[in-house]
Every structure is written in C-alpha cells, then in structure tokens.
C-alpha cells in the first residue's frame, strides 16, 4: 500500500445493489464497447442506451472523447496514459454500477490487459464486453473525425491501428461486425444479449 493510503479508510455504504434493484427494477451492468476508431462504438452505445432507456432502465454513457474533456484531460496518448485512461474509466464505471446504473462505455481500449483489469472490478454477470469489429480499411474510409488522415500525415503519432497496436478481444461476450450489420440490427443483437444475460442472473426490468 502506498504511504498516502495508510491513513485512508474505506467507508461502506448503507445502500446495496439489492436496494437499487428493488427501486430501479433492473440489475446494474457495464456494457463495454471496444474497437478501432471509426468502428461504430459510440454510435452503437448511444443507440443502445436509447433502447434501454425506453425499456425503463437507468442508464449512462461513458464516452472516450467526452471523458478526455474533463476527468482525463491531463492524459495524452502514450501507452502509459492510455492505460491510466482505461483504469480511471473502470473505476468510474464501478461507481455507477454500485448505484444500480446500466453503464455503456465506448472506448478503443486497445490493450487486452487493461480490459481484463476493468472486468476484474465487477461480478461476472455485471460485465459485458462487446467487440465492435470492423477492418482497418473500412474504419479508415469512414474516418468521421479525420483522425486517420492526420495519423497518415504524421500529425497524430501513436494512433491505434496505424502506428500503435490494437489487441483484439480474446473472449468477448459479443462480437458485432459493423462491416456487415447496420445500426438497427446491431442494437437489436446487443439488447437481446443484455436481456439474456440479465435473465440468467436476474431481471433486466421489473416486468421483463
């Protein structure tokens, strides 16, 4: 334990996940979207959140770009900073899950070790890793933010997929190939899986 942690005491909460379940009518989950830039992570996360919200779920999106505007604005894109970025997001997601929320997290999260470390923060039934699969050529042709163009021009060093690696998930709960599936089909598959996962360990919604 670090020296500055010797005088820090963990304060247990009086409310439990079961209390939030009784009030919210659904169990908390983390739905973690990982994939290359341009694969469709944020698009699917936002569409899935809307679908879950319509079902009465309490939801929140943690988006890679948004988090770097605030909490992680001090981090760059070195390997160490990327790992710290994902570590922080995992801890934030855990707070939301402790509060009974369905969290949709959309991050490139290129390293398997970092994704595994986040997964270890949760109970097995609480974490769903979705690999948003799309080949590099297609992602680069989409390039909604112009990032690949800048990376190819040498303006964005250490860009994932160009000069920094992306480690494909070894055992994701779900693979969504956005080269083949549109948004509607993809979201339908995600919601089916989330509902099935919830049914295995508790209802997703009070009447579901």
Swiss-Prot record:
Class of the enzyme per the UniProt entry, highest EC level: transferase
InterPro entries on file: APS_kinase, P-loop_NTPase
Assigned EC number: 2.7.1.25
Any one GO molecular-function label of the UniProt entry: ATP binding
Keyword Phosphoprotein belongs to the record: yes
Binding site for ATP: 35-42
Pathway entry: Sulfur metabolism; hydrogen sulfide biosynthesis; sulfite from sulfate: step 2/3
One Pfam short name: APS_kinase
Keywords, alphabetical: ATP-binding, Kinase, Nucleotide-binding, Phosphoprotein, Transferase
Function, as annotated: Catalyzes the synthesis of activated sulfate.
UniProt record similarity statement: Belongs to the APS kinase family.
UniProt protein name: Adenylyl-sulfate kinase
Organism: Geotalea uraniireducens (strain Rf4)
């Amino acid at each position: 334990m670090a020296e500055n942690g010797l005088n820090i005491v963990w304060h247990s909460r009086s409310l439990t996940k079961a209390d939030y379940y009784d009030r919210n009518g659904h169990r908390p989950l983390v739905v973690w979207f990982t994939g290359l830039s341009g694969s469709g992570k944020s698009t699917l996360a936002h569409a899935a959140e809307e679908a879950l919200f319509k079902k009465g779920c309490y939801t929140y999106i943690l988006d890679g770009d948004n988090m770097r505007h605030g909490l992680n604005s001090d981090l760059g894109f070195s390997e160490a900073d990327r790992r710290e970025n994902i570590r922080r997001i995992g801890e934030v997601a855990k707070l939301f899950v402790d509060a009974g929320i369905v969290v949709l997290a959309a991050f490139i999260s290129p390293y398997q070790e970092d994704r595994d470390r986040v997964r270890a923060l949760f109970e097995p039934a609480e974490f769903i890793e979705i690999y948003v699969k799309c080949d590099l050529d297609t992602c680069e042709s989409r390039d909604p933010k112009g990032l690949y163009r800048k990376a190819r021009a040498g303006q964005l060093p250490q860009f994932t997929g160009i000069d920094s690696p992306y480690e494909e998930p070894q055992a994701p709960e779900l693979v969504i190939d956005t080269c083949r599936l549109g948004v509607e089909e993809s979201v339908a598959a995600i919601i089916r899986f989330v509902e099935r996962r919830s049914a295995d360990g508790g209802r997703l919604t009070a009447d579901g």
